[in-house]
Design a protein with these regions (language model features):
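Low-complexity or membrane-interfacial segments used for flexible interactions
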Residues: 1-36, 44-46, 54, 86-91, ...
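Acidic (E/D-rich), amphipathic helical modules within compact regulatory domains
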Residues: 37-75
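Helix-adjacent hinge/juxtasegments
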Residues: 67-94
C-alpha cells in the first residue's frame, strides 16, 4: 500500500483503521488516501514502527515510576517527541519545539484531546470499537490546526498511547464483567 504525503490530503477528518489478520497494525487515512501506518513488532513488547511517505519512526513505552512514550526516527538515538504520563494529565514534548497537553475529553467518553498549553485544541481522537475490540478511531482536527508541521507525529503518538491503553484494558476483561468465565462448579454438600 502506497502512502501519500500528509501535506497533500485533507487533514480535518482522519481515521485510523485496524488491519485484517492477527498482526496489530493500523492505517491512518484521509478519504481514500493512506498517510501513515502504525505496526507493532511481534514479540517486541511495546515497540512499534510508524511509517509515513516521508519518514519512519519507532515508538516505545518506557519507565515504571515515571511512565513515558518516546518517538524516534527509525535507527536514531535521540527522541523526536516524548509523551510523559501523569495521573491527571499527560504532556507531549517535541524536541526543539512546542509542548502539548494530552488528556481525556471527558469522564464518560473514551476520546482524547491534544491541546496547546493555552488550551487551544489541536486534535480530538476518538477510538471506535466493535464489542470490546478496538477497530479504529477518528481524528478530528480544527481547521486552524491542520497546517501544524507536527500534526502527523502528534496523531501517531496519541494513537499509540490509546492502543496500548486499550490492549491493557482488554487483557483484564476475562477477569471482570458479564463476559467473565464462570467460576468452577462446586460439589453439592453431602
Amino acid at each position: 500500500m502506497a502512502l501519500v504525503p500528509f501535506g497533500s490530503v485533507d487533514r480535518i477528518a482522519l481515521r485510523w483503521l485496524r488491519g485484517p489478520g492477527p498482526e496489530t497494525a493500523f492505517t491512518l487515512s484521509s478519504g481514500d488516501a493512506n498517510v501513515a501506518t502504525l505496526r507493532w513488532t511481534e514479540g517486541a513488547g511495546s515497540l512499534a514502527t510508524a511509517e509515513t511517505a516521508d519518514a519512519q519512526w519507532t515508538l516505545k513505552r518506557g519507565g515504571f515510576l515515571s511512565p513515558h512514550i518516546t518517538a524516534r526516527k527509525a535507527g536514531g538515538r535521540s527522541d523526536l517527541a516524548r509523551l510523559s504520563v501523569h495521573l491527571s494529565y499527560h504532556r507531549i514534548e517535541l524536541a526543539g519545539g512546542p509542548s502539548y497537553r494530552f488528556r481525556r475529553a471527558g469522564l464518560l467518553v473514551p476520546a482524547w484531546t491534544i491541546t496547546t498549553d493555552d488550551g487551544v485544541e489541536v486534535a480530538h481522537i476518538e477510538p471506535v470499537r466493535e464489542g470490546r475490540t478496538l477497530v479504529g478511531g477518528a481524528v478530528l482536527v480544527p481547521a486552524a490546526a491542520a497546517d501544524r508541521p507536527e500534526l502527523l507525529l502528534l496523531a501517531v503518538l496519541g494513537w499509540y498511547f490509546i492502543v496500548l491503553a486499550w490492549f491493557e484494558d482488554e487483557a483484564l476483561v476475562p477477569l471482570e464483567g458479564p463476559d467473565a468465565p464462570d467460576p468452577p462448579a462446586r460439589a453439592a454438600p453431602p
